Swiss-Prot record:
It comes from Enterobacteria phage RB3 (Bacteriophage RB3). Interacts with the polymerase and the uvsX and uvsY proteins. Signal peptide: none annotated. Homodimer in the absence of DNA, monomer when binding DNA. This is Single-stranded DNA-binding protein.
Amino acid sequence: MFKRKSTAELAAQMAKLNGNKGFSSEDKGEWKLKLDNAGNGQAVI
């Protein structure tokens, strides 16, 4: 298992990843990412 990191670090990491060529720009609207109060992430694709 892996340990959960701080949500601030994860948010910074996600911000870095968003600029990369992982996803094409027209796919941007297909991904809905959110965090709940406990810091657990969900993605609706």
